[in-house]
Design a protein with these regions (language model features):
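Alpha4 helix (beta4-alpha4-beta5 surface) of REC/receiver domains from two-component response regulators
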Residues: 155-156, 179-197, 204-207
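Short amphipathic alpha-helix used as the core "switch/output" element in two-component signaling
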Residues: 153-168
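Alpha-helical linker/edge segments of TPR/alpha-solenoid repeat scaffolds
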Residues: 15, 19-22, 65-90
Length: 223
């Protein structure tokens, strides 16, 4: 069996360094795909192809991400679709949830949980990435950390969403390790749909997501 050390034999130092960078980027791209950071994964793969345009593993991974993104874009989210039993407001398998948090382990864990319950999931790890991801995919629900370590905070994302045309009724849930009284009052005043404390209980997250989607869909039906 030919191992990685055998593959590196005969490479010049520059070629070996380039190979190491490619493997490093591929590792990040795989991780991003697993946690639902598809836009970040595609950007990292661009770096892979800049170093190795014919990289087969990169091509396979890009194909997988492209297929997933296409599937997300094809979901049906508009209109009042009535199920066979006449219940219109229940969540659908096509419902997309966006999670925003700087903890990549949490992103991977929650993405897996949502998928197991039949939802689609996308993620972002910063305010700017969240804006780009939301604009690209238009999720049905947003779950965001309250306090990012750097940059704009979760409330900034919430206010951006609620002041963007057509997005005012998108449910928004906050994640928090701890929260002060002023932030809690502000969240209630501004109309945040729910606050979920960390460490996250998967059942609580799923129940909150289902409840928010059902409430939103019921109001759309009444309208």
């Amino acid at each position: 069996m030919i191992g990685e050390d055998d593959e590196l034999q005969g490479l010049t130092p520059a070629e070996a360094f380039r190979h190491a960078k490619v493997e490093h980027f591929l590792g990040h791209a795989r991780d991003y795909a697993d946690m639902g950071r598809y836009l970040a994964g595609l950007k990292v793969l661009d770096a892979v192809f800049g170093l190795d345009p014919s990289n087969e593993e990169g091509k396979l991974l890009k194909g997988t991400i492209d297929d997933t993104v296409a599937h997300i874009h094809k979901r049906t989210t508009n209109g009042k679709r009535e199920d066979a039993d006449g219940i219109q407001a229940r969540p659908r398998r096509s419902d997309l949830v966006m999670i925003v948090d700087q903890d990549e382990r949490l992103l991977t864990s929650l993405t897996g949980t949502l998928r197991r319950y039949g939802f689609m999931a996308i993620t972002a790890s910063s305010y700017d990435e969240a804006l780009e991801t939301f604009s690209a995919f238009r999720p049905e629900v947003v779950i965001s950390e309250v306090n990012f370590e750097t940059g704009p905070k979760g409330f900034d994302l919430y206010l951006w969403l609620k002041t963007s045309p057509g997005n005012q009724d998108v449910p928004f849930l906050f994640l928090a390790t701890r929260i002060d009284r002023e932030t809690l009052i502000a969240g209630k005043r501004f109309g945040v749909d729910d606050l979920i404390m960390k460490p996250v209980d998967d059942d609580v997250v799923i129940a909150s997501v289902i409840n928010c989607i059902s409430r939103r869909r019921s109001s759309q039906i009444r309208a």
